[in-house]
């Protein structure tokens, strides 16, 4: 049932997929677990009053899950021009200049994709939070795992933002992406921890 191809590729010596793609994949799992809670709620008499709202969250999560799967590959694609730029020759001043320009261009994409991962996972948490509080109590532990995975996904993606921003010559752009990543990470971390603690109390 489990497709091990991605895991095996991740374990290989290939530079991509790496931490960014893995973070997107973990984010997709967070969305899937939140969806599981919703799907186990729909159709149950005890949750008739919230069924319409649950269906809304399920529809949103489906889109977010698909987007995160797309971002797994997008992260690998964003790394390719950066890796190619680092391999460019630098034997002459002209070659060195061309190499540096190529690196700087590639760094933009290499930071934007993990930022997109972070933004998307933060939205997953919105829906997971609702479903943890209003969805099936039988699946509440799965909502907690969703929160834990979402936290890991955001933290992982943030590292890719920071490491690439550190190499940017454009100090203003670097500052902006670092600040956005830091803000998303801080807020999402806090929300995920609160949600996880709520689930622990509910299931203990």
Describe each PLM feature range.
Residues 1-17:
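Short, hydrophobic/aliphatic alpha-helical segments
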Residues 33-40:
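A conserved active-site cap/scaffold subdomain adjacent to cofactor or substrate pockets
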Residues 40, 45, 82-89, 156-168:
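Acidic, Mg2+-coordinating active-site segments of isoprenoid diphosphate-utilizing enzymes
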Residues 120, 124-127, 131, 139-199:
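Preference for long, well-ordered alpha-helical segments
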Residues 75, 79-148, 152, 164:
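Amphipathic alpha-helical interface segments
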Residues 25-29, 57, 64-71, 106, ...:
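Amphipathic alpha-helix face/heptad-repeat signature
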Residues 12-33, 139-157:
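Conserved phosphate/anionic-ligand binding catalytic regions in large, soluble enzymes, centered on
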Residues 45-84, 184, 191:
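A structural-propensity feature for long, helix-poor, extended segments
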């Amino acid at each position: 049932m489990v497709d091990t191809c991605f895991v095996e590729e991740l374990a290989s010596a290939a530079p991509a997929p790496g931490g960014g793609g893995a973070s997107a994949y973990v984010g997709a799992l967070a969305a899937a677990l939140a969806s599981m809670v919703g799907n186990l709620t729909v159709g149950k008499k005890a949750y008739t009053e919230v069924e319409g709202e649950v269906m809304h969250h399920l529809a949103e999560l489906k889109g977010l899950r698909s987007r995160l799967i797309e971002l797994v590959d997008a992260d690998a694609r964003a790394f390719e021009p950066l890796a190619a730029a680092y391999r460019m020759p630098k034997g002459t001043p002209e070659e060195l200049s061309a190499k540096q320009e190529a690196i700087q261009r590639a760094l933009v994409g290499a930071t934007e994709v993990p930022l997109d991962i972070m933004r998307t996972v933060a939205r997953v948490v919105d829906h997971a939070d609702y479903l943890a509080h209003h969805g099936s109590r039988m699946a509440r532990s799965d909502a907690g795992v969703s929160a834990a995975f979402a936290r890991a996904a955001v933290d992982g993606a943030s590292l890719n933002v920071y490491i690439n921003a550190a190499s940017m010559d454009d100090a203003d752009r670097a500052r902006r992406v670092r600040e956005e990543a830091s803000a998303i990470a801080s807020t999402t971390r806090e929300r995920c921890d609160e949600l996880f603690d709520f689930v622990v109390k509910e299931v203990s």
